[in-house]
Amino acid sequence: GPDCLYVHTTREALDGDWILFREEHSHAAEHRLCADQLADWIDRSPAIVFVDDEFSTGRTLINMVQQLRERYPRLGERRLAAASILSRVSPENQARLAEAGIACECLVRLEHQDYERMVTGIPVKEAAPPAQGPLPDLRTLYTAEPLPDPRRGVAVGCYTDCCRAAAEELLSRLREELPDQGALLVLGTEECMYPALTVGSLAEQTGLCATVRCHATTRSPIGICPDSAYPIRNGVLLPSFYGGDRKTYLYDLAAYDAALVVTDAPAAVDGTACTRLAAALGQ
């Protein structure tokens, strides 16, 4: 609802009071949770939901809850739940989550199997940088007023309204730029995903293009394989839109008539990432 408070962990090093967590099995083990207003939010919230795309063992979640309870004892008085798209948590770890007072819900529950062993025979490779070639027109189409930052915490109603307003303004300008009935890629950058999804959803609803697809760059290194039975068949290695020397990836690209990057990275169009992305889309 509009009164729901939302904050997500981040791997960005930002100013303020942050709680550091470790996700041992992750490609980027350290992530942070903004604590600037967390004590007040816990006091105001009768229930707290931890959301992830996938829970594999549940250990990271249990460790996070234990760490938060040590710092915020009132968390022990709150209802806790975990929600995910996928869950492959074993029955033993499901019992540990229940003992920790965490109710779990998922959309798809996978059998607890050794998935790593199941893919050992598949010849995968890491994504490579795109080949260099002629670049299409690169420019900043629209700079919105700064949106509320979910890394530091937002009220859901305010955040979704701001994202919707920015998307409407952006698409009103985009109508003059796109070929009729073309294919549009809307691309988020790393943790800046929801604004891109909002733009893509609105573009689809209004019939701006014949097809609209939404991607996001990611720090996750995933093996690619052209086999038709394998889900990730192509990918490119890109420098981060946020600068520095970290690697990011973009998977399963298709052919598009136009690509719209929705990002909170400063001066993104002037960086190497944008030119490399344009090269990848031109391949």
Sequence positions of predicted segments:
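PRPP-dependent phosphoribosyltransferase catalytic core
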Residues: 66-182, 193-283
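Hydrophobic, well-ordered secondary-structure segments
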Residues: 1-2, 6, 49-50, 83-89
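Intrinsically disordered, low-complexity linker/loop segments enriched in Gly/Pro
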Residues: 43-71
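Short, glycine/charge-rich flexible loops or terminal/linker lids adjacent to PRPP-binding catalytic cores
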Residues: 3-48, 62, 217-256
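Glycine-rich, histidine-containing beta strand-loop boundary motifs that form or position
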Residues: 8-11, 58, 84, 108
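A generic short-segment signal for beta-strand/edge and adjacent turn/coil regions
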Residues: 15-20, 50-54, 73-76
